[in-house]
Amino acid sequence: MDQDALISKEDSEVEREASGGRESLSDVIGFLDAVLSSEPTDIGGDRSWLHNTINTLQRPGSTHRAKGEGEGEVSTSSTQDNRSGEESRVSGGTSEPEAEAHARNVDKQNIHWATGRGASTDSVPQDLGNGRDSGILEDPPNEGGYPRSGAEDENREMAANPDKRGEDQAEGLPEEIRRSAPLPDEGEGRADNNGRGVESGSPHSARVTGVLVIPSPELEEAVLQRNKRRPANSGSRSLTPVVVPSTRSPPPDHDNSTRSPPRKPPTTQDEHTNPRNTPAVRIKDRRPPTGTRSAPDRPTDGYPTHPGPETDATKKGIGENTSSMKEMATLLTSLGVIQSAQEFESSRDASYVFARRALKSANYAEMTFNVCGLILSAEKSFANRVDENKQLLKQIQESVESFRDIYKRFSEYQKEQNSLLMSNLSTLHIITDRGGKTDNPDSPTRSPSVFAKTKENKTKATRFDPSMETMGDMKYKPDLLREDEFRDEIRNPVYQERDTEPRASNASRLLPSREKPTIHSLRLVIESSPLSRAEKAAYVKSLSKCKTDQEVKAVMELVEEDIESLTN
């Protein structure tokens, strides 16, 4: 007894020391894995069939106490109750005394509790996914690691190993687990309750290794029958803590007393018959515990609603691969990314390859690897596209610069053509006005090539005008003087030759002009030249004083020399 107490004390100290660091993160991750993978059904449903089947085994002489009154009672949880009910239902009743079978179950739990101390956290999803824990705070110190094997497996194991109990006792397990009073629930005992609080995660699941075996066909059939027998009443789900029925539950007519509201302690049949004895039913803490799991995590039915997250995930992955591939191909086709589903399945592009591998991945590590590859391949393709766009923009910029050079050269060429055309026009005017006669130095007047019937100009006596003295030879030409004022605004002298200045008055147009058309065209050539304003006026004045073609030619040669000296 001293050795057992010493072992339990050392275990509690080790559990207190290791509850903070070693098991907090990994056990919480495994616990969340099991919560996400499990699919609890009918939690909090009507479980009256539990009491109906278990009541058939109630004998007047059997109680919870294995020893006398003074040695206390053994606190049982709903997991042991359900297992006892399962034994009575599957095997049809046992021949051994019930107290002895209960003690042997506790011995098996102690073996798993002692041998699984150094186990890894790999068994977390298996234990949690089974869903046998009922949410009771006062579990025995084996940390809730009850063996999850079926009732038939237990009976078969007991029949094969009759000396099992002797071996259990030889292991030197704590006697107080099987015989003495339950552990306290308040104060330091609750904090040291072998990892039942939030601060130590869920370490009781890491203590059991090799307990959850692959379910046999017989056990699966028993579970299916039990689920069929259970009424589908999932609507009456209770969020408040409920009373866990004991193995010695009252008959159906006492159901209402057992299922009393959680705020009031229930009155069981044991309390009616033997009020002095300590009750076999332990009441759950009235305060909603912060360190225990919620109802979906630990279904109170105590039945494995999920065969195991790992095997079920592989089955789901095999079935969902083809459907997810088809859905992805259909989505890409509808969005216009690909032409058909066959293109998605047979494409050799890196993005499509990683996408197919991510859809076919069996676990999270492989999926993460493939998704990272998909992201990197997409980034690489984007970088290549950006480089292509940069090259294209560079080519466009170069072509635009070449077009600018071409346009500049074309504009210069156009200016040259315009100047050449202007000189040709002026030369053409001179030739037509002379009538094609170059060798006629004797004739004082140049006659045009086209003769029209006109009246002879009769000289008329004009009245004296004071302005005639200032004009000199340029009297009767007020329109030319008026044109010189606006010469800078004339842009096209060829059009100006045909079209009189619009600012001239009608009276000035009616005055006769002595200037010949050839002299007028030469004057326009001088006006359009890049000479200064004073030089232009001097050349125009000298040109108007010319009497013969030789004088006109000499003046125009001087004009051309000045223009060439300026341009060169």
From Swiss-Prot:
Chief site of localization: host cell
Subcellular location: Host cytoplasm
Residue ranges of the region described as L protein binding: 412-445
Key words, A-Z: Chaperone, Coiled coil, Host cytoplasm, Phosphoprotein, Viral RNA replication
Region (Multimerization): 344-411
Composition bias, Basic and acidic residues: 7-20, 99-110, 150-168, 453-462
Region listing for N0 binding, in residue ranges: 33-41
Molecular function GO labels: RNA binding; RNA-directed RNA polymerase activity
Sequence positions bearing Phosphoserine: 249, 257, 260, 447, 449
Entries under Gene3D superfamilies matching the protein: 1.10.287.340, DNA helicase RuvA subunit, C-terminal domain (1.10.8.10), Viral phosphoprotein oligmorisation site domain (1.10.287.320)
Protein name: Phosphoprotein
Native source organism of the sequence: Sendai virus (strain Hamamatsu) (SeV)
